[in-house]
Structure formats: C-alpha cells, structure tokens
Regions:
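A solvent-exposed, acidic/Ser-Thr-rich amphipathic alpha-helical stretch
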Residues: 27-32, 45-100, 107, 118-122, ...
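Short helix-adjacent coil turns
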Residues: 40-44
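Positively charged n-region of N-terminal signal peptides that target proteins for export
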Residues: 1-7
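Sec/Tat signal peptide C-region and signal peptidase I cleavage site
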Residues: 20-24
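Bacterial N-terminal signal peptides
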Residues: 7-19
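Short beta-strand edge/turn micro-motifs at domain boundaries
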Residues: 124-151
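A short, structured loop/turn motif at beta-sheet edges
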Residues: 95-102, 131-137
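Beta-strand elements of well-folded, non-transmembrane domains
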Residues: 110-114, 131
C-alpha cells in the first residue's frame, strides 16, 4: 500500500510538471529587447539607458550616430521629451547567442504621440542589435535601426 501511494504521488507530480506550459527564458539580445520595449512603453529614459553599455553605439532612423553614454542619453532624451511612446512592436525577429555575445534582428514599429498635440506618428523599419553579457547582465553594444525603405509595407504582425 505504501509503495502504491508513493508511485501514485510520483506519477501525479510528473503529470503536473510536464503538463505545465514550457517557455525558454529569454537571454541575450532577446532579453535586452524585452527590457528596452518595457522601458520605452513606460517612457522611462533611465530604464532605456540601462539597456545600453556605457560604450555602446546607436544609430536611430534620421538621427546622427550616438556613441557612448552621454550621446545615447541625448538621443533618447530628445525623442522622449518631444514624444510619448504609445506602442512598440518588434516583428520578424531572429536571435543568435554565442557565449557572451548575442545578435538580434527584425522589424520594428514605434508609435509616438507628439507632446505638441500633433497626430501620432508611426515609425517603421529594420533593426540589428549586438548585445554582450557584462557584469552579469546583457546590454546593447550596437543598436542599428533604419527606416523602412520606400515601397515596402512595413512590419508584419
């Protein structure tokens, strides 16, 4: 009787364990992308900056290169002081992680509501990110976004 109870308990444990939804934890560039999206949707400049290494380089659409913490802060400060981020979508994403380096790519859609009261603007384009694991966390070291080329339909959802 005791062994039967032990077997039934073990079987029940296995059934419950393997029937739970399994989801791989996000790592590398994918984890940084998730943190960046959350920070942007919250319009939180400091949280956005935490996703970048202090020596990162950023190319935003229609903006000059931002190299290092000071220039990256200035680039996002300008964007967030003039606009409220309403939506951020990354689509057609791909990720590859090799040791302490990770690459991410895909398409983006960023919906901005100008604080001047103008109509919302939807920016679409393509991006490539390189992230590194530094000090126990993943951060962008390269973030390159480019506007969607003329004549394309933009990101697919």
């Amino acid at each position: 009787m005791r062994y039967l109870l032990l077997r039934v308990t073990a079987l029940a444990f296995l059934i419950v364990t393997f029937s739970l939804p399994c989801r791989a934890a996000e790592t590398g560039a994918q984890a940084v992308d998730s943190s960046w999206i959350k920070a942007m949707k919250a319009n939180d400049l400091e949280a956005v900056l935490k996703t970048y290494a202090s020596d990162a380089v950023v190319w935003l659409p229609e903006a000059k290169e931002a190299r290092g913490e000071k220039e990256i802060r200035s680039a996002f400060e300008g964007l967030l002081s003039a606009n409220t981020v309403k939506e951020v979508v990354l689509s057609e994403t791909g990720y590859k992680t090799m040791g302490k380096v990770s690459v991410g790519w895909g398409r983006f859609s960023l919906t901005l509501a100008p604080k001047s009261g103008s109509n919302p603007v939807v920016m679409t384009g393509r991006y490539t990110d390189i992230a590194e694991r530094r000090g126990g966390r993943w951060v962008y070291v390269v973030d390159h976004a480019s506007a969607e080329p003329a004549g394309t339909e933009g990101p697919k959802k």
